Regions:
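Glycine-rich FAD pyrophosphate-binding loop
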Residues: 1-14
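FAD/FMN-dependent oxidoreductases across multiple families
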Residues: 38, 203-287, 293, 299-304
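C-terminal helical "tail/cap" subdomain of flavin- and related membrane-associated enzymes
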Residues: 286-406
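Short beta-strand to alpha-helix junction loop
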Residues: 62-84, 205-210
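N-terminal FAD cofactor-binding segment of flavoenzymes
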Residues: 11-52
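Helix-loop-beta segment of a Rossmann-like dinucleotide-binding subdomain
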Residues: 54-73, 110, 198-202
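Predominantly flavin-linked oxidoreductase catalytic cores and closely associated redox partners
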Residues: 85-229
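Generic enzyme active-site microenvironment
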Residues: 3-4, 127, 259, 265
Length: 406
């Protein structure tokens, strides 16, 4: 296996909050203890409630919990652990080499890439696009489409001196809402806090001048976040990224496959990105191995993989599309475990959205509860739906990470 990486490790990357469903994958890879050593223990997710406190959804409460914890990780350190492990397992890892073109019409893919010594060619038996939000094949093959139902943009950075939640909740991710979207606080080692605000593109267009000032003004929109940020010091650049939501019209073709964000991304809400990438990579690797052993089965295997991954992605999408709605706000602020529905929602927050039929059945019950609650507050729900539809048509330009590729 040869991996072509255009950058060099360590490097900055978003995606610092793992899910409990990452833990079995890390265990199978043999790196769980290494990740434990660099991470902060995460036992749940905190959402403010109407009484001024928090509703903490603890992963131990998840229906059929496969892991009761996860970790918050400095992403550069996490990637370094995985990169070193892959090299130790025999992978040919090349850094500082940028893929410039691919040809997929021959018996084997042809990849042309450039490093410091010039142009190089590769003819892999199978081509896997794991380029993340750069979406190399999606752009090359013109398969990438903006999500017509959801768009958002974000500003984020790292700070020291941000107040943490007390006791065993100190490592939890905290999710707050504001008038134009939502915010995250992710505790990292060494008193570092990853802080970000995900916003409607319409609101992001009001940004003028200094990005740090705009981020701080946005964070001040939520009094609880402002209180936790008192006395905090920024220790990293403020980054902006936008046009989050996209999906490619297909995931695969003869001898090629897209994985993770290279195929689709919706929103950083619920911290699903790293888990979806790793789950798709594990399933994708098994699919490629089977297809190379039996080429006649490739198309069938690819269809099965795409159905499987779309199913889980669609579960996250349903919640993400509605999270900032007044209906979802009330349901999360006043959770009730009728028919184990709350436990199923916690399982979703843990990433268990693919194969657990008990969870999936109860999430359908939650959808029915949501629909009835929305009818009970129909004018507010209707206004929120119209606002979301308007934002889905907006585009944000000013990405500091991906050059506004969309």
């Amino acid at each position: 296996m040869t991996l072509l990486e255009k950058g060099h490790h360590p490097r900055f990357h978003i995606g610092e909050s793992l899910l409990p469903m990452n833990m079995p994958i890390l265990q199978r890879l043999g790196v769980l203890e290494q990740v434990r050593a660099i991470g902060v223990l995460k036992l749940g997710a905190d959402f403010p409630n109407d009484s001024g406190g928090y509703n903490t959804f603890r992963f131990a409460q998840a229906l059929g919990a496969q892991s009761e914890y996860a970790f918050q990780v400095p992403r550069a350190d996490f990637d370094r652990v995985l990169f070193a492990h892959a090299r130790g397992a025999g992978a040919d890892l090349r850094e500082g080499i940028k893929v410039e073109s691919v040809q997929l019409d021959g018996a084997q893919p042809l990849v042309q890439a450039r490093d410091a010594d010039g142009l190089r060619q590769f003819r892999p038996r199978y081509l896997i696009d794991a380029s993340g939000r750069d979406t190399f094949l999606g752009n090359t093959l013109k398969l990438k489409r903006a999500n017509p139902r959801h768009q958002s943009a974000a500003l984020f950075s790292h700070f020291r001196g941000v107040a943490r939640r007390p006791g065993e909740d100190a490592g939890n991710i905290s999710i707050y809402r504001h008038a134009h979207g939502w915010m995250w606080l992710i505790p990292l080692p060494d008193d570092v806090m990853s802080v970000g605000a995900v916003c409607d593109p319409e609101y992001m267009k009001t940004r003028q001048g200094d990005s740090e000032a705009f981020l701080l003004r946005t964070l001040a929109l939520n009094p609880d976040v402002a209180a936790r940020m008192q006395g905090a010091q920024r220790i990293a650049p403020v980054h902006a990224t936008g046009n989050y939501a996209y999906e490619c019209t297909r995931m695969s073709g003869p001898r090629w496959l897209m994985l993770g964000d290279a195929y689709a991304f919706v929103d950083p809400m619920f911290s699903s990105g790293v888990y979806l990438a790793m789950h798709s990579a594990e399933r994708g690797a098994a699919m490629v191995d089977a297809a190379l052993r039996d080429p006649a089965s490739e198309a069938r295997l690819q269809r099965g993989l795409e159905r499987h991954l779309r199913r889980g992605l669609n579960e996250f999408k349903w919640f993400i599309y509605r999270f900032t709605s007044p209906t979802m706000r009330e349901l999360f602020a006043q959770p009730r475990n009728v028919l184990q529905v709350e436990q199923a929602v916690v399982a979703m927050l843990a990433g268990d959205v693919f194969d657990n039929r008990a969870v999936l059945r109860r999430l359908r019950v939650f959808r029915a509860i949501y629909a009835m609650s929305a009818l009970a507050m129909l004018p507010r729900a209707w206004r929120a739906w119209r606002h979301r539809r308007r934002q889905a048509r907006e585009q944000f330009h000013g990405d500091t990470l991906h050059g506004d590729k969309s």
